[in-house]
């Protein structure tokens, strides 16, 4: 049976200087879903990320100016929404998120009727990242295990909330996005997944104390201003796949 626009899953991968890792990520993704709609959003890279994406068979959206992690993600989600997507899976292009774990996200959504599933790996991350997580959890009241994971599955209702103008003012795919989702009654669950260290490069945020402190200041201000919205516990869902 042919796939209609409203049964199609799109994969959105923001990429900034990821020419080294991107080819392997796309190859592994094609192995899992040979007919998948893959969108690589090149966030004004200085290397051959665009070429790597095109060589891997992805639809590459080149940004003329750097939008940042969430801006690039939202651009890809808007493109998918315009194409009539059913679901969107967001992944990093640096090799951390494994296509082999996608089934755990889809199983969790199918079994819980969640609007959003977060692929969580609480064991990952540097001291800086874990320090930031603990502070954000303390002030926001959100008990997610992995607040900053970009490995997520969104349904059409969640996508509609995140492609709007109000969501454009967010900086990162974590607290602000969760606040918007939870504040609009979306059901968000987590599922444990395996992750690998990034293949190359460093995090745009969690690579120095000044960047982490600036990120935390932005996030904490958002947490305080949205506190009544964010004081919701995410459901921790352990996927019990028959394939495990």
Residue ranges and their predicted role:
Residues 8-10, 176:
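Cell-envelope/extracellular polymer assembly enzymes that use nucleotide-activated donors
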Residues 10-14, 62:
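Short hydrophobic beta-strand elements that form part
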Residues 17-31:
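Short, well-formed alpha-helical segments that are part of the catalytic scaffolds
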Residues 42-50, 95:
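A conserved acidic beta->alpha catalytic loop
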Residues 50-82:
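Conserved donor nucleotide-binding strand/loop of the catalytic core
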Residues 72-73, 77, 124-237:
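Conserved catalytic loops of nucleotide-sugar-dependent glycosyltransferases that act on lipid-linked
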Residues 85-96:
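Short beta-strand-to-loop acidic/aromatic patch adjacent to the donor-nucleotide binding site
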Residues 103-126:
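Conserved donor NDP-sugar-binding/catalytic core segment of glycosyltransferases
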């Amino acid at each position: 049976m042919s796939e209609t626009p409203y049964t199609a899953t799109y994969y959105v991968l923001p990429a900034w200087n990821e020419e080294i890792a991107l080819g392997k990520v796309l190859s592994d993704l094609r192995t899992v879903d040979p007919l998948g709609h893959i969108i690589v959003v090149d966030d004004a890279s200085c290397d051959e990320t665009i070429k790597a994406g095109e060589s891997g068979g992805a639809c590459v959206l080149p940004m003329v100016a750097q939008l940042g992690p969430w801006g690039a993600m939202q651009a890809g989600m808007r493109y998918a929404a315009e194409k009539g997507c059913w679901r969107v899976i967001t992944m990093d292009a640096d090799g951390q998120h494994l296509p082999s774990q996608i089934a755990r996200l889809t199983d969790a959504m199918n079994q819980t009727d969640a609007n959003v599933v977060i692929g969580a790996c609480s064991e990952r991350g540097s001291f800086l990242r874990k320090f930031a997580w603990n502070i954000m959890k303390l002030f926001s009241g959100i008990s997610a295990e992995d607040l900053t994971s970009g490995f997520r599955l969104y349904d059409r209702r969640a996508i509609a909330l995140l492609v709007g103008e109000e969501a454009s003012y967010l900086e990162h795919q974590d607290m602000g996005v969760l606040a918007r989702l939870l504040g609009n009654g979306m059901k968000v669950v987590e599922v444990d997944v395996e992750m690998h260290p990034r293949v190359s490069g460093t995090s745009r945020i969690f690579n120095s104390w000044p960047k982490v402190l600036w990120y935390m200041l932005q996030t904490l201000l958002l947490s305080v201003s949205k506190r009544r919205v964010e004081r919701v516990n995410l459901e921790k869902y352990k996927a019990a796949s028959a394939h495990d």
